[in-house]
From Swiss-Prot:
This is Small ribosomal subunit protein bS20. GO terms for biological process: translation. Belongs to the bacterial ribosomal protein bS20 family. One of its GO terms (cellular component) is cytosol. The gene is rpsT. PANTHER family: 30S RIBOSOMAL PROTEIN S20, SMALL RIBOSOMAL SUBUNIT PROTEIN BS20C.
Length: 87
């Protein structure tokens, strides 16, 4: 455990950030899984709706600093490519 006052504060701040990032990453994986399930099922409408939702969550994760913007762009373009292959 830290002895310096500021480091004690940082430990608390880092724990809060860790939990927030964990929740955001978990939600990203969930939404991506839902999109993949819709694509596998061949349900174009559900896949399109889920693509929109997942893209929004990736953008939010970038805004919060949880993932890098290039990582989000890569994931989103991959999902878009899978969606476009459905047609």
């Amino acid at each position: 455990m830290a002895n310096i006052k500021q480091q004690k504060k940082r430990v608390l701040t880092n724990e809060i950030a860790r939990k927030r990032n964990q929740a955001i990453r978990s939600r990203l994986r969930t939404e991506t899984r839902k999109f993949n399930a819709a694509v596998e099922a061949g349900d174009k409408e559900a896949a399109e709706a889920q693509l929109r939702v997942a893209s929004r969550f990736y953008d939010k994760a970038v805004t919060k600093g949880t993932i890098h913007r290039n990582n989000a762009a890569n994931k989103k373009s991959g999902m878009a490519a899978r969606f476009n292959k459905m047609a």
